């Protein structure tokens, strides 16, 4: 049936943080079928009121955009190119950085592109803390199995910028057969990777999330 699905893990990272992930949609996104990657969130219930930042993939436009959410109100901070326009099965990679001074920068790359394209940079320090990060999908009945997130990484080695190089937006106005695994940073302490997510599986199938710890240290998850 039509509805929403989400998954979260504890995460307090905000400053000097980089988020990277791949997305594959088996449909062209629309106002009724799109996804959000919550970079930060005050709540583990992504369908309710919360304070945080998220990247939206699709929606009214076939692009990737950065939003800030306060309670149940979302504000567009920066909007990227319409890289999914006319694409019935978009495959893309997204990278977001937030430095110590509050500058947010995000890049996108289609699977067919060799390098990331810098979309926008904007300063926003309205929300300084986080408790979770996660994935949130909104879908109609026929699209409920059409979302795949992969190669998810979070690291804390972002350099600090001094000034934005882009003008902020005015809010008023198939996975590869053998995908390349991004190289991990040398220091991966405290880093966890979402390796695979499966939800709304067949009637007799199991739903699961696979989390990979690339370090040699044990990591305790108090909640999932």
Per-region residue spans from a language model:
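Extracellular glycan-recognition regions
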Residues: 1-183
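A structural motif detector for short, solvent-exposed N-terminal "entry" segments of globular domains
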Residues: 182-224
């Amino acid at each position: 049936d039509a509805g929403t699905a989400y998954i979260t893990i504890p995460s307090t990272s905000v400053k000097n943080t980089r988020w990277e992930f791949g997305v594959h949609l088996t449909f062209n996104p629309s106002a009724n079928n799109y996804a959000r990657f919550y970079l930060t969130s005050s709540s583990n219930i992504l369908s309710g009121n919360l304070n945080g930042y998220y990247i939206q993939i699709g929606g009214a436009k076939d692009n990737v955009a950065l939003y800030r959410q306060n309670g149940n109100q979302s504000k567009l901070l920066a909007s990227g190119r319409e890289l999914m326009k006319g694409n019935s099965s978009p495959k893309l990679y997204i990278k977001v950085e937030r430095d110590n001074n509050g500058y947010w920068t995000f890049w996108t790359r289609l699977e067919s592109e060799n390098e990331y394209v810098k979309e926008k940079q904007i300063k926003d320090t309205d929300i300084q803390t986080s408790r979770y990060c996660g994935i949130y999908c909104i879908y109609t009945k026929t699209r409920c199995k059409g979302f795949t997130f992969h190669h998810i990484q979070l690291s804390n080695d972002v350099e600090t910028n001094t000034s934005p190089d882009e003008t902020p937006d005015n809010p008023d106005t198939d996975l590869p057969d053998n995908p390349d695994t991004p190289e991990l940073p040398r220091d991966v302490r405290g880093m966890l990777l979402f390796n695979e997510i499966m939800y709304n599986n067949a009637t007799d199938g199991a739903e699961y999330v696979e989390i990979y710890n690339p370090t040699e240290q044990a990591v305790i998850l108090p909640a999932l």
